[in-house]
Amino acid sequence: INENTKILDQIREGCVPFFNINFNKKKLKIINLYNQGQKSNHRLYNISLGKKFTNGFVRNGHDVLEVSDRDFLRNNKSFSLIPNRSNFQTFLINTFKNYNPDILFFGHTKNVEINTLDSFKSINKNIILSQWNEDPVMPSLNYSKQNISNIKLYSDFVDHNFITTDPLILNKTVNRNNFNFFFVPVDKNIESLDVYKMKPKKDLFYAMSHGVNRAILKEGIEDDRINFLNRLVNKIPDIKYDFYGFANKQPIWGNDFNNALINSKMGLNLSRGKPTKYYSSNRIASIMGNGLLTFIDEKVQMNDFFNKNEIIFYKNINELADKIKYYSKNEKVRIKIARNGKKKYFKLFNETKITKYFIDISLGNKASLF
């Protein structure tokens, strides 16, 4: 019997070739590579897009294997205490062989070598490589220059790039043929607060930093947002502000951020750089997704997604000041717009819809952002 079994196995192996693909394309295997933030004790858990993407992929029925590149390198240093990039490449390739993913989805890394991506393609010619980046890419902003450079490391090699700014702005800096816009998602388990149902004592919330990898502010940094906030405070000094990263108040993170958020009726969605079509930091998910009435410059063109009964647009700082004063005193209309805004945000850009959009583009299906 054993000899017959061996013969049958040999016949099967000779007749049926091995294809290195996942036949059930409705259920994909995805490696999601991003910084999980062990070094910072997970203080960024509530603003981590990588975490939201994992949640969205899983809730859409896919399997996800998470890899934290920076944590691996930090935890696997050589005897000289230098991160061992070579070991990380070996780890990635062996993990890839064991898991055999359909998609490698990675963001904000420079730790994956092009040769490693080449190896992935050699192992599985059907692999789909996608890069995402949530930071600003407007060429006029000094901060963006390094970010664009980081994106360009992989942009021509991967199948798809996803950014939080209208890709048209990159017309002269990269080949944008494989670039797609995505909206910062909200997640029902993360943006879980309904501030419009509460009784906040402060009027206006704003939190900024000099980069999420720094817990504190840098000295000697010029920031247009500081100038804007100073002018705003001078125009309406009677408003009860709750600003962080401003006027010698350090940034706040994690649960401290949420505890501060619920104390304000309204939030200012002011991102670094000039107002640019569709770009917002993930601040918008935190304030709008948690039910604060949200103010945003009309030049960001969010009116393509939201109307005046869901978010408050302003043309300039004078109009912003007037509207802050008005809505701070008119509770019913403030609550109504804040509720509408959160509802619309979750309808259009929740974690399952955004990750479905990623998958549709990756598989060449008809894709719609909303």
Question: Model-predicted segments: where are they?
Answer:
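Short, charged, surface-exposed secondary-structure boundary motifs
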Residues: 139-143, 190-195, 322-324
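A short, histidine- and acid-enriched strand-loop-helix "catalytic/donor-clamping" loop
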Residues: 127-144
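Conserved acidic donor-binding segment of nucleotide-sugar-dependent glycosyltransferases
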Residues: 311-317, 326-331
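Short hydrophobic patches on amphipathic alpha-helices
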Residues: 96-97, 120-121, 261, 324
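Nucleotide-sugar donor-binding catalytic core of glycosyltransferases
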Residues: 1-79, 83, 99, 108-115, ...
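A charged, aromatic-enriched C-terminal amphipathic alpha-helix characteristic of glycosyltransferases
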Residues: 2-10, 329-362
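Proline-aspartate-enriched helix->loop->beta-strand connector
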Residues: 96-104
